[in-house]
Amino acid sequence: MSKKKENPFSFFSYVKDESDTSSLPPPPAPIHSPSSSDNIEIPLPVFNNNNNNNNTTTTNNNTNNSNTSTSNNSKNNRKTAISFDDDDDDGDEEDEEEEDDDDDDDDDDDETNNIKSSLPQLQPQTQPQPQPQPQPQPQPPIKPTITKATPINKNVNKEINNNNNNNNNNNNTTTTTINNINNIATSANNAGTTTSKKKLIQLFDDDDTNYDDEEKLEKFDRSTPMSLPKEIPKKVSSTLSNSFDPNIIHNQSSPPPPPISIPIPLPTTDNLNNINSNNNNNNNNNNNNNNNNNNNNNNNNNNNNNNNNNNNNNNNNSNIAPPPPSSSSMVNNVNNNSSDNSSSNNNEENENLKAEITKLKTLIKGLKIQCIKYKGDKELSESKLLQSENRLEQFKLKEANETKIMEDMVAQVEENLNAMKKRAQYAENQVEQMKQEIQQLRHQNQQNSMNNPEMQELRYRLQDAKEKGRMVSQLLFQASNDADLNIKNLMRGIETLQNVSALLFSIDKISTIPNQK
């Protein structure tokens, strides 16, 4: 069995409809920061008698275009949300299939290691610090560019006559169109933010996701703590509010600041609670804005009907002078530009949010894998702790038994020592008593010997016997010596007699020996 290898970043499938691409606004042009070397030429509005009425007619068209653009944006947001949910469901089914494959194949660890080595490592997101904007330097005077007047049509003359008769109606329509544009911009912004926040809440509320595919991801290095921005700085918030406010008309000396994209802070429990509360508030605001938009659309339709009736009634008045140029056309142009910018910014924000959601999903999967591994490590450590605790208890019991045995032995030795001490003391007492008795007996013997006369006579007799024995021994020694000398002299006489007898026996032989001369 071979495991399914899938791209972990395939949770988005962007839905593109050919019908909606035509109505989408073009992407915004990049805004350059002002420099001293660039000569900026800003076109100034020129009000002609012929163009005033064209501006009044284009306001209603702009409101309709803005309504269609916002509706298309909301459709796109809904389609991306539906596709996002479908991809999540497909991912869950695939995860269940892979769980079955993993149960059959537990020995395919090398493949997972290769997949892990092939995946890119995720780095912790860090918030870019807002760079200080350079101070604008004095610039040379800007040359205004004058736009050419368009040719006058027959319909324009009719509208001029209608405007002379219906100045009050036009003032009401301009105010309503401005309010409509503002409400549409705010509703578009709120719709983009609410969809993204709902997706974030769904990400962190899903607890039924499968974790088999997550083992393919690489470990995320959590050695560095991730910083969670609690609040947006005041400077950045002020620049954001100024950059997206459609009612602000920027001067020539201070060009509009570029839009600033701030990274989304990582979600915590406090942030999720705040997001839920903000979502409820945003939903209520969106409902109120939709109701206001419907009311404004009804008012616009009524005003258009009144204008048409007035045009039919005043076709004959063709030579009346045009009214003075009003500032409402300029405000409408600025509002239209701001609505286009806001829609383009909303699209960019949606794309950025989708990219960040993908990163956050990979982060969440990595963190879930780490949680699973940490749980396994925790269980192993707990089992080791239990084993070590059991060993400690057994060791403590052994030590307690050994200490008891040693204490018993020490107690017995102490008892024996005490008994030996008692015996030694008793023996010493007995020895002292015997010494005293011996001294007493000696004393008594001396006293008895001094007092008895018989003992004295016996002593004298012994002394006489000793002296007599000495005298007898000396006399016997002298007698023995004299006897030895006498015996020796007798032996010498015997020898001499033997020699003489031997000479006398050899005399006959000597006489018979002839003489030889």
Swiss-Prot record:
Compositional bias of kind Polar residues: 236-252
Highest taxon above the source species: Eukaryota
Gene Ontology CC annotations of this record: centrosome; early endosome; midbody; recycling endosome
Gene Ontology BP, a term: regulation of cytokinesis
Family (UniProt): Belongs to the ENTR1 family.
Protein name, per record: Uncharacterized ENTR1 family protein
Biased composition (Low complexity): 48-75, 271-320, 327-347
Ranges of Pro residues composition bias in the record: 127-143, 254-266
Coiled-coil features, chain-numbered ranges: 340-452
Biased composition (Acidic residues): 84-112
Region (Disordered): 16-148, 156-175, 216-351
Keywords: Coiled coil
